[in-house]
């Protein structure tokens, strides 16, 4: 058994070392605007973490190293529950983190901040437009001056990225989609609220798709030349269809990368629309000529190809790739291609899987300065570490028939470090031959902070930079976390985290919570969450059990893929193994199961099969009726594969012709020209079993108190799933409660709604488990 205390190891040392000197200096040269939300000075009573304490934490993000490598620009969001909003402002710190200064005091969130190459300006987004300002350091104080808005884009700017010479900018804005509003069809109906669609993908995540993102290019200078639609170029101009760039709903400019000379852009795009879009994950990497608009494709003919990054010398491109179309949890391979410039235009050759012999997923690729190696992060055995893919010493000449030499992957962060590390945002090669990776880190015990990881022949050194929340963390009572490897019903090993309440005494008894992970493909790692916060749950007096059941993504692809086509099967037994194991401990009394999304499906399923294991359930945004879910969710590739189809997305181009009329193809899986092996009308055995064992078919077995939570704007798992589950619980005479948030999506985001969620969550658990 391996046990760490809260903020164990370097976390505890960092808090002890800097808690007394981490002071946010507010320069008088930076005026405070009405509506500014600053750092919370909350007092924690008796070391007890509460939802109020959770929402008081500052949320650090998007660090950017200064051009001279001496300072870091980053943002922190603070929340006012009373005002029901959060505001993000900017900070600058030195590399030791002992001089953190607040440099903006805006009443509107400031995001996407970037340095000028001389370090004298920054550009950022405020109020949906690009702004610039001068930044200066005088007598130890940072100050902004000469703020000016440099974009005037009516549809708004979502994000921007400057070219390497900073003479151009690419930015995300929005164009009309295929979905019509009333005034698009009837000019006199300007107060009507309907929408009209003749194809799929008319809604996505939490919104009607009335507009889609496109990426535009414009000239840029920090002096303030205005950027407008009239002087911007749409990268997708001239395409036959309305494609997205970047891909909805969460894609950003990490999906586009400037070449080192600024003349080309590599980007990821799914050039599909309507039904084909809804059933496919096939994005490709394209190379766009900024001057001519010409475009070429790196055609992988598979699933997601995302996150392209040019090497600093322009000789290579790296990206993340999934092999199979329609399967969004396929292995994330780190791909690399050579770029030949001998004919003036970039010609791609020698595509190589740099992680071919690495069994985990890769994410967040970052090139080394010499263009020989690629840094990335990966969830491996329950924690997210940093890795390096080392390129071969010798590259085959361009156009050579010699197969490029393999790459070698090495771990950078130590295997026993119970923290999640991001990819580096800056890599520094030091005079002594060591390399320092500036990155982010967090754990179940503290939110994201900045960290420097220095590697050399003598080992790895970790240096905490920021401690934005040390004033809160230092007030909280410590607790213990344990990693258990449990035996599954089929003789495999399953990592299960267990968090114990503060002042845990094994001679006493405590209630427990088994967490059912969403996804279903994901991982219960050392991440920090403001929605499902396990330290908060432990602080409420619960033993928190986190089983990395079948389908989780940090234990190799075989463990991940087993769940597809087997939702009612082994992963449900994994939950029961974890729950029965902890319930057998003398210090555990009653136990609940709680989960969101697929975790909500798990809860509804366990309601019908658990017998007398659990004493209460909470399902948030859970799938209840799989048949109806297939017909109402938006990204249809997901249930089509995972519900038992297990096929790559395939389309019959002959559909609608005499030789292939619309309708069934006679193979039991192809309908409307689309292979729908995971549909309710499929004859695939796994799909038939999947729908037969949908949770709604097991409600006659329900007898345990159930709370149902759902967002009214959830289009991934529509709200009627939760309403149906609650109605059935009521019909079965099961004690039940319904909590609906009409203005929230799959997640509960607004501060007062988040507070309501937490209070009602614990009220239900306390009622039935304490």
Q: Residue locations for each model-derived region?
A:
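Predominantly five- to eight-bladed beta-propeller fold
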Residues: 30-37, 88, 174-241, 268-271, ...
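Short loop/turn segments that connect beta-strands within beta-propeller blades
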Residues: 94-98, 135-138, 220-223, 289-293, ...
């Amino acid at each position: 058994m391996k046990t760490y205390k809260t903020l164990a190891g370097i976390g505890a040392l960092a808090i002890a070392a800097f808690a007394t000197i981490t002071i946010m200096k507010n320069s008088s040269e930076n005026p405070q605007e009405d509506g500014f939300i600053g750092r919370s000075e909350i007092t924690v009573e008796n070391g007890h973490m509460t939802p109020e304490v959770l929402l008081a934490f500052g949320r650090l993000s998007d660090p950017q190293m200064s051009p001279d490598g001496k300072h870091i620009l980053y943002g922190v969001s603070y929340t006012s529950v009373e005002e029901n909003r959060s505001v993000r402002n900017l900070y600058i710190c030195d590399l030791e983190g002992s001089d953190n200064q607040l440099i903006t005091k805006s009443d509107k969130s400031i995001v996407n901040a970037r340095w000028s190459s001389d370090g004298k300006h920054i550009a950022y987004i405020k109020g949906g437009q690009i702004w610039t300002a001068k930044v200066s350091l005088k007598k130890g104080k940072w100050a902004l001056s000469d703020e000016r808005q440099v974009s005037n884009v009516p549809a708004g700017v979502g994000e921007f990225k400057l070219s390497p010479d900073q003479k151009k900018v690419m930015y995300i804005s929005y164009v009309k989609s295929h979905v019509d509003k009333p005034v698009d069809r009837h000019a006199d109906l300007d107060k009507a609220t309907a929408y009209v669609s003749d194809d799929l993908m008319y809604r996505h995540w939490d919104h009607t798709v009335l507009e889609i993102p496109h990426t535009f290019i414009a000239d840029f200078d920090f002096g303030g030349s205005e950027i407008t639609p009239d002087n911007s170029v749409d990268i997708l101009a001239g395409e036959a269809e309305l494609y997205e760039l970047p891909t909805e709903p969460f894609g950003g400019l990490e999906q586009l990368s400037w070449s080192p000379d600024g003349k080309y852009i590599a980007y990821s795009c799914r050039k599909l629309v309507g039904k084909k879009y809804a059933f496919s994950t096939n994005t490709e990497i394209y190379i766009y000529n900024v001057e001519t608009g010409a475009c070429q494709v790196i055609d992988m003919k598979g699933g997601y190809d995302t996150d392209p990054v040019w090497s600093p010398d322009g000789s290579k491109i790296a990206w993340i790739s999934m092999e199979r179309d329609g399967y969004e949890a396929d292995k994330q391979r780190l791909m690399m291609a050579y770029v030949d410039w001998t004919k003036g235009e970039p010609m791609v050759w020698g595509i190589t899987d740099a992680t071919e012999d690495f069994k985990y997923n890769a994410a967040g690729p970052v090139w080394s300065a010499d263009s020989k190696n690629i840094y990335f992060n990966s969830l491996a055995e329950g924690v997210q570490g940093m890795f390096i893919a080392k390129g071969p010493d010798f590259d085959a000449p361009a156009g050579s028939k010699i197969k490029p030499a393999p790459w070698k992957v090495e771990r950078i962060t130590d295997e026993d470090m119970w923290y999640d590390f991001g990819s580096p945002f800056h890599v520094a090669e030091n005079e002594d031959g060591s390399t320092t990776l500036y990155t982010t880190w967090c754990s179940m015990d503290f939110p994201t902070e900045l960290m420097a990881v220095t590697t050399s022949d003598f080992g790895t050194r970790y240096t905490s930079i920021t401690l934005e929340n040390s004033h809160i963390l230092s007030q909280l009572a410590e607790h213990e976390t344990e990693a258990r490897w449990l035996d599954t019903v089929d003789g495999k090993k399953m990592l299960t985290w267990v968090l114990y309440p503060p002042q845990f005494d094994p001679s006493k008894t405590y209630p427990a919570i088994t967490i059912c992970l969403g996804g279903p493909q994901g991982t219960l790692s050392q991440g920090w969450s403001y929605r499902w916060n396990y330290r908060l749950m432990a602080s409420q007096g619960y033993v928190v059990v986190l089983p990395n059941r079948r389908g989780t993504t940090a234990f190799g692809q075989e463990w991940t893929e087993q769940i597809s086509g087997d939702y009612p099967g082994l992963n449900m037994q994994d939950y029961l193994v974890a729950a029965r194991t902890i319930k057998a401990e003398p210090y555990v009394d009653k136990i609940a199961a709680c989960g969101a999304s697929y975790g909500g499906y798990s809860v509804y399923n366990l309601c019908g099969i658990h017998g007398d294991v659990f004493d209460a359930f909470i399902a948030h945004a859970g799938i209840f009726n799989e048949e109806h879910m297939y017909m109402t969710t938006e990204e249809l590739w997901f249930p089509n594969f995972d519900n038992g189809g297990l096929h790559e997305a395939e389309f019959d181009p002959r559909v609608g012709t005499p030789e292939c009329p619309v309708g069934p193809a006679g193979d039991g899986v192809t309908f409307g020209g689309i292979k729908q092996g995971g549909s309710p009308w499929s004859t695939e055995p796994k799909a038939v079993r999947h729908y037969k064992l949908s949770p709604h078919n097991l409600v006659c077995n329900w007898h345990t108190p159930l709370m149902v939570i759902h967002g009214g704007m959830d289009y991934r798992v529509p709200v009627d799933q939760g309403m149906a589950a609650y109605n059935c619980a009521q019909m079965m005479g099961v004690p039940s409660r319904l909590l609906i948030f009409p203005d929230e999506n799959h997640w509960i985001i607004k501060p007062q709604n988040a507070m309501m969620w937490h209070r009602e969550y614990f009220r239900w658990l306390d009622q039935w488990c304490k």
